[in-house]
Amino acid sequence: MKTDGGNTWRASHSKPLNTANTMGEPFSHSEYSVHADQSEFYLNELTEHSGQDNPCMNTSRLNTNRYGHPVVHPCPKIHCICTQSNIAAIGSDCTGCVDIAQACKMLRGGLGCTQDPCVKNPHTQCFTDVSNHAMRNVLPLNVSNTEQFPIQIEYANGRNPVLNPMDDLAMRAALLLSKDIDLQNTHILPSTRISIEKNIPVAAGLAGGSADAAAVLLGINSAWQTNYSRCDLLGKAGALGADVPFLIWGGAAYGSGTGSCVTFFETQTLYWVLCFSKHPLSTRKVFQELDRQRSGAGCNHHPVFSNPAECAEMLKKAIKRGPEALAALLHNDLTSAAKMLMPEIAERIKAAERCPGILRAIISGSGPTLALLAEDAEAANRACSILKDTGVICKAVSSPAYSSIYWQT
C-alpha cells in the first residue's frame, strides 16, 4: 500500500466459515485503499486474518481529514483497524438491522480487546496485526479525470482466468454501480483501470473472484463518491453471487436465501489449514454434477441443515462451545459432486484427518481446496508441517476476519 501523500481511506473485508450448505467459501479477504490526491486505488486480496492482537489505542493520535472522517496513524505493521465509529456508521446504515452495542461487543471479542464497548465515543480503537500468514492479490486501480467513461480490467501476468470479460466479477461489480448513475445530473465520472495481480489459486473454492468483486463495490463507491450505504451495497452484491454479500461485511455469519440475508455470530478465533490442489475445479461443473445427483435417487442432504430456521441457532451454540462442537456440524453438500469430478479428494480428506489435532476436513466452497479445522494454533501449524512433508501445498490460517475501514492522511 502506498502512503506517500494524499488522503487515503482503506477497508478490509472477509468471509465467514462455510459451516453449512451455503454457496460461500471461507477465508477470502479483500482490502482496498484509495489515494484521492494521487488518484490511485489499490486492492489487496488475502486468504486469512491472523496475528497477535494489539491493545486498544487511545484517542490522542486521532483527528479528522477534510471529509470529516476519523484519521489514524497506525503502526506500519498494522494491516487492519476496527473502529467503533465504523460500527456506529453500520448501525446508522442499517437502522433496525444492527444493534450497535452488540456489534461493538462482537468486534471486541473477536479482536481480543478488553476495553468496554464505547458507542458514545466513536474514536475508541481496536487494532489487530495481520502482517503474518498473508496470501494476497494486488489490484491497482488507476483513476483519471477524462470525459470518457471506460472501465478496463487487465491482469498483471497477462493471463486473464476469465475468457469473457463480462464473466469477470470485478468488471461486473464496476458496471453494476455505473448503471445506477445518471451522468446527465452528476459530474462526469473518471475512467477507471484495474490491474489484477492474481496470487490466490483460480477455481480453488476460495472465492477469490468474489472477494475482488466485493472490494470493487466498496472501493469504487468511495472513488466515484456514489455514496451508497453498506446495506445498499449488500443488496447489489447479491446480484453478483450468493457469496459476495459475506465479503461486504466480514466476521462469522450464517447466510441463507441468495446470500443477502446474513446472521452474524460472536466467535472465538478458530484455526485452520488450507490444503490446495495443483488442479482447478470448475464451480459450474460441480453444480451441474450436484444437479445430476439430486435428480435421481440417493440425494444426500445433511439432516442437520434440513431446517434453515434452526440452522443459525445450532451453529451459534456450537461456535460458543468451541471447535470440537463446531467440527461435528461441518458439512458441504458439494462434497459428493466434487469427489465425482476429482476422486483424489476423498483420499486427501482421509489423509488430512489422520493428522493429530485436526478435528474435521471439508472441501472449501466447490473445491478442490480443503479446509481443515484444528484444535488450536499449535495443531494447525503441526498439521501443516506434516502435510508439507508429503508434498501437499498448504497454509495455516485463522478466522474470522472483520470488516473495517479507516482513513489516513
Swiss-Prot record:
Presence of the UniProt keyword Protease in the record: no
UniProt feature coiled coil, ranges: none
GO BP annotations listed: isopentenyl diphosphate biosynthetic process, methylerythritol 4-phosphate pathway; terpenoid biosynthetic process
Primary enzyme class: transferase
Catalytic activity: 4-CDP-2-C-methyl-D-erythritol + ATP = 4-CDP-2-C-methyl-D-erythritol 2-phosphate + ADP + H(+)
SUPFAM superfamilies: GHMP Kinase, C-terminal domain (SSF55060), Ribosomal protein S5 domain 2-like (SSF54211)
Transmembrane segments: none
Family the entry assigns: Belongs to the GHMP kinase family. IspE subfamily.
Protein name according to UniProt: 4-diphosphocytidyl-2-C-methyl-D-erythritol kinase
High-level lineage: Bacteria, Bacillati, Actinomycetota, Actinomycetes, Micrococcales
